[in-house]
Amino acid sequence: MLKVAVVGASGYTGVELLRILHCHPEVAVTCITSEQSAGKPVSDLFPSLRGRYAQVLENLEPIRVAEKADIIFTALPHKAAMEVVPTFLKLGKRVIDLSADYRFNDAATYEQWYEPHMNPHLLPKAVYGLPEVRRAAVKGAKLVANPGCYPTSVILGLQPLLKHKLIETAGIISDSASGVSGAGRGAKVDNLYCEVNEGFKAYGVGGVHRHTPEMEQELSLLADERITITFTPHLAPMDRGILSTIYGRLLTPATTAELAGLYAEFYGGEPFVRVLPAGGVPSTAHVRGSNFCDIGVVVDQRTGRVIVVSAIDNLVKGASGQAVQNMNIMCGLPEGLGLEGLALVP
């Protein structure tokens, strides 16, 4: 039985980790921390966990946490993870970090978009934890940088096209809509019910969203050349989910059926990627609460563009579910263990 700690359990990714790990047959959650709510029962913070987690939330004391766990999930804000991850690694623990602190290959890029990096020497040692791209590297990793939610949806949507060199690498566009939980659990005026309900808006327009360089780094590695992407995120009036609509110009003519077949073959062995039949497009409703990424691909013959639509649950495949998927791979467990749940319908 794996002993697991969840560090920073007061947010949505933290509670989602607890929800998923409760159903994992090879895991015992032995430590749960929250600086804001230390001393309170977990169920006080999240009544949905009542009767399933009897623990009291603890202060974050890295040595004490490490004594209790084999695997540590850090669900902390950016920068906060950097303050504790080195200690966990020195103590021989394996870490899956859900912040952006270790997603970049170089400190300069991180610092351009976030802030000064406290331990840049760890960046080359971290594995970007998108299993469908880096499964072999994740298997032997000590530190996994769990991908962002938007990048997960976009990278999975584009991977077959880039690997097969089917589209121009210039001019790729993604319009992506996320549920409000993607903004976190903290109180913000923009996320109040009356501000979000019955509305749909773009934000981070003009290439300023922090997930942009993360996408570009990974897409460039897939294409083996420098890629820039026009990425515009949107806030949708729903709790959870991401729908990315991605546009690329085909280098050679192809039909919808041909590309749907290519995608189906490319992802045929993947447990959590479902390719829709030719002409089908996914919905966030069909992945809600699950670890699936649903993908549809359509060719616009008039313009010579291919349109890829991908749907994920931002809190599951876009965060905590993917983190558990990475844990399974790191520990030599069946990849889908604890993640077999289907979408919540309706």
Swiss-Prot record:
Active-site residues from the entry: 149
Protein's recorded name: N-acetyl-gamma-glutamyl-phosphate reductase
HAMAP family, alphabetized: ArgC_type1
PROSITE patterns assigned: ARGC
GO biological process, alphabetically ordered: L-arginine biosynthetic process
Listed GO MF terms: N-acetyl-gamma-glutamyl-phosphate reductase activity; NAD binding; NADP+ binding
Keywords, comma-separated and alphabetical: Amino-acid biosynthesis, Arginine biosynthesis, Cytoplasm, NADP, Oxidoreductase
